[in-house]
Each structure stands twice: as structure tokens, then as C-alpha cells.
């Protein structure tokens, strides 16, 4: 996540869960003026505040109805490749639902919060359900070499296309080969270089 997560709280009934989550995530608690007495950041207009956070790329955990979050960010939704995580949590902590940015941190965020609250996250992205991993969100130590091909790769995998994994002798990259699709000069049946080992320290 690019910036500190904002935990959004509209009223006193949601405050205990919101406070618990913000402490657990070391995140800022954003509370509505006049309804919440303790917060790191106060706001008066909920819709305007949500829209601004979303536009600024800040992950949002809203301890409120999903509809509030959806209406708040609706006009700011433009590119799924860059949208921040948006997660809804029921006021009583009984449900955790990643709404947007599932493969940009929302699913992982929902899992962490769910573990804290002792509930199961309501994750709906097909890759996570079928394979237990976000195909465009590699495990730690890897980066995605060609994100532009994720959609076609995912669709093929979900359709049951056979998969073969190959690596160079140094294991510096992993090539995920799907069926007979080719890339480049066609000398290899590589669908694309899905993951490569990150050179980051």
C-alpha cells in the first residue's frame, strides 16, 4: 500500500471496532465531527472525505454499510489498475468485505482484519477463490513482469487451461506456460513471464 490506511468511522456505534482496527493496523482513525469524540482526523462531509481519500490513493477501511463507501467513491472510480484498497466492515465486526482494489491490497487487508475480529473475509475475486492467490499480486520476493497480460492469463487459468512452470538455471525468473500460446518470435510456447524474482533489498 502506498500510504497509511484510513479507518473511516461515522458514529459512536462503530467506534469500538474502528478503534480496534486502527490500533491493529497502526492506521489513522477518521471520525465524523459531532458524532465521534476521538479520532486522528475529523471530517464533516462523509462523501466528500471518502472521495478525497480515494482520489489520493489512500486505502480505506470503512466501519459502516458498504453502500456508504460505494456512494462515496463512485465518482472517483476510473482505473482498476491504480485504485486503492476499499474494505467495508460491519459496525459490530461480523463481516469484512473487500469492495475495490482486491488485488491491490484489499483482499490481504480484509484477511488481516478478519483474523483480528475472528470472522471469515467475504472475498469474491475468482483467482483467490480457485487458487488461493491473487494472480496479479505475487508473493513476497517476486514482482509481476508483465501486468498487461494478467487478464488473459487469469481467464485462461479459470477456464481450465493446462499450465507448465519453467525457470532458468539461476531461478531468477519463473515462466508460466499456458497451452500453445506464444510470445515474441514464437520460439517458445511461453504465454508470458508471470513472475520474476525481485531485486529489491
Predicted regions: what is each one?
Residues 1-60, 72-83, 89-201:
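SAM-dependent methyltransferases
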Residues 62-66:
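Short His-Asn-centered micro-motif
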Residues 68-70:
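Short glycine-rich, flexible loops that bind phosphorylated cofactors or substrates
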Amino acid at each position: 500500500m502506498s500510504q497509511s490506511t484510513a479507518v473511516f468511522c461515522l458514529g459512536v456505534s462503530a467506534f469500538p471496532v474502528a478503534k480496534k482496527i486502527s490500533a491493529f493496523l497502526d492506521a489513522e482513525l477518521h471520525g465524523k465531527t459531532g458524532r465521534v469524540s476521538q479520532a486522528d482526523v475529523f471530517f464533516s462531509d462523509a462523501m466528500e472525505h471518502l472521495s478525497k481519500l480515494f482520489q489520493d490513493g489512500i486505502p480505506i477501511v470503512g466501519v459502516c454499510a458498504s453502500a456508504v463507501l460505494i456512494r462515496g467513491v463512485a465518482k472517483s472510480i476510473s482505473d482498476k489498475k491504480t485504485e486503492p484498497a476499499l474494505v467495508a466492515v460491519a459496525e459490530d465486526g461480523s463481516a469484512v468485505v473487500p469492495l475495490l482494489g482486491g488485488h491491490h491490497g484489499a483482499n490481504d487487508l480484509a484477511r488481516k482484519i478478519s483474523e483480528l475480529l475472528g470472522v471469515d473475509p467475504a472475498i469474491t475475486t475468482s483467482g483467490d477463490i480457485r487458487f488461493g492467490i491473487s494472480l496479479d499480486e505475487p508473493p513476497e520476493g517476486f514482482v509481476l513482469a508483465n501486468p498487461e497480460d494478467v487478464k488473459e492469463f487469469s481467464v485462461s487459468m479459470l477456464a481450465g487451461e493446462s499450465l507448465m512452470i519453467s525457470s532458468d538455471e539461476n531461478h531468477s525468473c519463473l515462466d508460466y506456460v499456458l497451452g500453445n500460446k506464444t510470445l515474441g518470435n514464437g520460439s517458445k510456447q511461453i504465454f508470458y513471464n508471470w513472475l520474476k524474482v525481485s531485486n529489491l533489498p
